[in-house]
Amino acid sequence: MIADGSEDEEKWLAAGAAAFKQNAFYMQRAIDSNNLKDALKYSAQMLSELRTSKLSPHKYYDLYMRAFDELRKLEIFFMEETRRGCSVIELYELVQHAGNILPRLYLLCTAGSVYIKTKEAPAKEILKDLVEMCRGIQHPLRGLFLRSYLAQISRDKLPDIGSEYEGDADTVIDAVEFVLLNFTEMNKLWVRMQHQGPAREKERREKERGELRDLVGKNLHVLSQLEGVDLDMYRDTVLPRVLEQIVNCRDEIAQYYLIDCIIQVFPDEYHLQTLDVLLGACPQLQASVDIMTVLSRLMERLSNYAALNAEVLPYFLQVEAFSKLNNAIGKVIEAQEDMPILSAVTLYSSLLKFTLHVHPDRLDYADQVLGSCVKQLSGKGKIDDTRATKELVSLLSAPLEKYNDVVTALKLTNYPLVVEYLDTETKRIMATVIVRSIMKNNTLITTAEKVEALFELIKGIINDLDEPQGLEVDEDDFQEEQNSVALLIHMLYNDDPEEMFKIVNVLKKHFLTGGPKRLKFTIPPLVVSTLKLIRRLPVEGDNPFGKEASVTATKIFQFLNQIIEALPNVPSPDLAFRLYLQCAEAADKCDEEPIAYEFFTQAYILYEEEISDSKAQVTALQLIIGTLQRMQVFGVENRDTLTHKATGYAAKLLKKPDQCRAVYACSHLFWLEDRETIQDGERVLLCLKRALKIANSAQQVANTARGSTGSVTLFIEILNKYLYFYEKGVPQITVESVESLIKLIKNEESMPSDPSAESFFATTLEFMEFQKQKEGAIGERYQAIKV
């Protein structure tokens, strides 16, 4: 078997093939002339080429296949000879006169095949003789190929049920005995290869054994194809005998391959009914055997079997498949003390997937698997093996993918304990997977207890207190994570206000301790969710039992104030400013004047102390004016105070055009059409006159700075405000004041040089003409204006 090099091996193969071809030619010539003696002579010489020890398994196989093809011709010739009167018994004896044992046994197997076909003797006797005689070849390579030839030519002549060779003297038991004996001897030869030659060639020998393994495995395939091998025979005879040989050979390569062969070639039904026998052998295998892969494939096959055949599911419970697999995995891990953490996690991951497929309604089984995994991981600390971490994520993702419902996963008490063994980065990944599952399946989390459990699972993306120093998180990834948390908040919902208030309190607890950089993402949706809760509160008097509500608007507004207070420190004062105004509007609808005033006060403080950018001030002031205009809860004193502050802010804006627009916007604060108490025409007119004054000042500044009269757009905007209030019937806005302003605009020298202002003015005049065409009071009022 030892080759000096690939070139020498090619030469030996070429020389052997040439001699083989020459003898095959003379053998064929003897066959053609019906010369049995010469046919035997040249066939023996031809087969002598298989006695070489210089070829690798791959090259030897080439030579073997040439011999196989020629032996098929010789077998046909033997059959014809028996028809011409040659005694098959004499032929069987004659082939044994060959000088060398290897050619003799090949010829004996060929003659034995003919002997069985003639049915002149029981098939079991001939098969037993052949399999015993083959023990004469103990060279591993030559012996394996010889027995492979025996298995090949005999597989269609086994006394199986329904076979023509079945009879009173020949039963399927004889066929099974023959195949098992041949398998046992072949496995011994195959294992012996591992221990021949120097230690430095171990890798080469293992490679060669890998090339030869199918020769051994074919015996198990033959067994699986026998009609007579039913469940009883498989359980009582085949499986115990095969496992006995596998365990006793004590060879890592053989044990791994043959166990896998059993799983792959025999029916799933047989595996299900013999689980205890098959699994009982696993702890007895060598510690180096990759039992993880073997058991994973077994569980995968059983899972697929259950998925394709729903009617077999009761049998899984009947044979206690889960318990047997779980116990077997525990024993294997216990037997292999040095088993890598990856292997253990993979085994439990496969078991969990098996459980979810076969027993989806048994959450206790799934939780038991997770508990076993926790027990195995205990004392290991954070897992630093990348592949093991990936497998752990796969294990944790399995319940989410199966149930499409995080609520179900939350019922698994050991689930969060497994999450604890993930490192910080992987916890973030797992948290994202959980949140995406919730959003994809529109899963509502309806109790504070479940929300608390959920946030324990996803704390990797809502809490940065335990992140290691120096851990840099990509900003885009961070924003994406926090946006997903913001979306998640809207999936935490309960129609009962009391339970919903408990939920938002849980959110508050986690968000306020989650680190300042996350607050600008999480506080706004929390505020919105809480404001929705306020709208669902029962109106006073709706409770017929007179029971005092534990959740009141006052409590909720206090809660809102507490969470918004955290934002200016982030810093996100503009965000806090907007939220205060939203809360003020909500308080207005609840008729809570003191609370609404307090929220406005907080907004004003932020405007004065935190918002310094001129553009931001303009936007903020527009929000103040718009919100204050819609407020109906304030009494005269509070409203005057807030309105006075707003007009003061407007007059202090940096840019004159901004001042002008803010001041004329304040005019809306003094005239609300639907509220007679807020209809102060004098102050409306005062705001508009002040706006005209500021617009005039802005034009002078433009003239001084740029040498031009500046845009007339501000005057046209003010004209539109005059028209609005004139149409609403404000007494102080007279026809004369409107006509005077129109005349002022027409006299502006800058109008022709500013197409946009010219177009704006033309559109305003067209609007006035359109209003004149209307019937009723509005048409009459506009008719009075002479353009």
Curated annotation (Swiss-Prot):
Any one GO BP annotation for this protein: retrograde transport, endosome to Golgi
This protein's UniProt keywords: Acetylation, Cytoplasm, Endosome, Golgi apparatus, Membrane, Protein transport, Transport
Keyword Lipid biosynthesis: no
Places the protein is found: Cytoplasm; Endosome membrane; Prevacuolar compartment membrane; Golgi apparatus, trans-Golgi network membrane
GO cellular component terms, A-Z: cytosol; endosome membrane; Golgi apparatus; mitochondrion; retromer, cargo-selective complex
Broad class of the protein's primary localization: cytoplasm
Keyword check for Membrane: yes
Modified residues (N-acetylmethionine): M1
Highest taxon, organism lineage: Eukaryota
Family affiliation: Belongs to the VPS35 family.
Subunit structure: Component of the retromer complex which consists of VPS29 (MAG1), VPS26 (VPS26A or VPS26B), VPS35 (VPS35A or VPS35B or VPS35C), VPS5/17 (SNX1 or SNX2A or SNX2B). Component of a retromer subcomplex consisting of VPS29 (MAG1), VPS26 (VPS26A or VPS26B), VPS35 (VPS35A or VPS35B or VPS35C). Interacts with RABG3F.
Function: Plays a role in vesicular protein sorting. Component of the membrane-associated retromer complex which is essential in endosome-to-Golgi retrograde transport. Also involved in the efficient sorting of seed storage proteins. Binds alone to endosomal membranes and is required for recruitment of VPS26 and VPS29 to membrane. The VPS29-VPS26-VPS35 subcomplex may be involved in recycling of specific cargos from endosome to the plasma membrane.
Protein name (record): Vacuolar protein sorting-associated protein 35A
Organism: Arabidopsis thaliana (Mouse-ear cress)
Organism ancestry: Eukaryota, Viridiplantae, Streptophyta, Embryophyta, Tracheophyta
Name of the gene encoding the protein in the UniProt record: VPS35A
